[in-house]
Amino acid sequence: MTRDDYERYAAAFNARDYDAVFDFYAENPRMAFFGIEITTRQQLRDFYSFLHQYVRETVVIEKFASSEELAAVEGIVRIEGLRDLTREILDANGMQQFFPVAQGEVQEMRQYIHYHLENGKIVTVGCAIVP
């Protein structure tokens, strides 16, 4: 994955073009972040379709490095509340480690995101918030 590839991926993610986003993933990816584990493309679609009903999420890439096996990104993930995403809604959807977001609230988080690659496709994703 090149920087240009990742720029296209981030642009598709920011535009919520899930079909284009999913084209970057292997058939059965494994994502693990903040207590969520996703192992199929359908789970990936379901998770982001749910979350993005409540928030507008965008990724700003600050640093990028890659090899044939790994892409590493440091960036700012911006979350803007479109509707109230309450503790009750989060808990009911297995998202206990996520924070509530009120309509109009903006959260910006620096994240390190690591993508493991096989044949140019994302097979695993992990991320960490950096204080």
PLM segments and residue spans:
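C-terminal and inter-domain tail/linker signature
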Residues: 1-131
